[in-house]
């Protein structure tokens, strides 16, 4: 998801 790419999550989720 975009949340990971934006840096909201510690892991780089797509």
From Swiss-Prot:
Keywords: Amidation, Amphibian defense peptide, Immunity, Innate immunity, Secreted. GO terms for biological process: innate immune response. The keyword DNA-binding does not apply. It is found in: Secreted. Expressed by the skin glands. One of its GO terms (cellular component) is extracellular region. Belongs to the frog skin active peptide (FSAP) family. Frenatin subfamily. This is Frenatin-2D. It comes from Discoglossus sardus.
